[in-house]
């Protein structure tokens, strides 16, 4: 009962904080918040510089694949556990998901820098 109460309180508090953070900024929307600020001086150039969307997508793809590789780092220690068959099955599924994601990105030309 104590564990269920703790879990319920944590989930309720998290949902309350997320909803407050979502709706609070919408109450005070005015144009001054959207303007750039450079220590009280007039901006030297435009603060809304365009950037390459391809660069952004490749960076996000790298972060996702890097996170999946980081999940495999404790694999040598996990193999020595009592259920190594389960460990190898889960790691094989993780590597398969990584390979399928890479194949999907490759087929959709997500890794092509020039078009």
Curated annotation (Swiss-Prot):
Subcellular locations according to the entry: Mitochondrion inner membrane
Reaction equations catalysed: a ubiquinone + NADH + 5 H(+)(in) = a ubiquinol + NAD(+) + 4 H(+)(out)
EC number(s) recorded for this UniProt protein: 7.1.1.2
Keywords carried by this UniProt record: Electron transport, Membrane, Mitochondrion, Mitochondrion inner membrane, NAD, Respiratory chain, Translocase, Transmembrane, Transmembrane helix, Transport, Ubiquinone
GO cellular component: mitochondrial inner membrane; NADH dehydrogenase complex
Domain of life: Eukaryota
InterPro entries: NADH_UbQ/plastoQ_OxRdtase_su3, NDAH_ubi_oxred_su3_sf
One Gene Ontology MF term: NADH dehydrogenase (ubiquinone) activity
Transmembrane segments: 4-24, 55-75, 84-104
Gene Ontology BP annotations: mitochondrial electron transport, NADH to ubiquinone
Enzyme class, UniProt record, top EC level: translocase
Assembly information from the UniProt record: Core subunit of respiratory chain NADH dehydrogenase (Complex I) which is composed of 45 different subunits. Interacts with TMEM186. Interacts with TMEM242.
UniProt-listed PANTHER family: NADH-UBIQUINONE OXIDOREDUCTASE CHAIN 3
Biological role: Core subunit of the mitochondrial membrane respiratory chain NADH dehydrogenase (Complex I) which catalyzes electron transfer from NADH through the respiratory chain, using ubiquinone as an electron acceptor. Essential for the catalytic activity of complex I.
Protein name per the record: NADH-ubiquinone oxidoreductase chain 3
Organism listed in the record: Necromys lactens
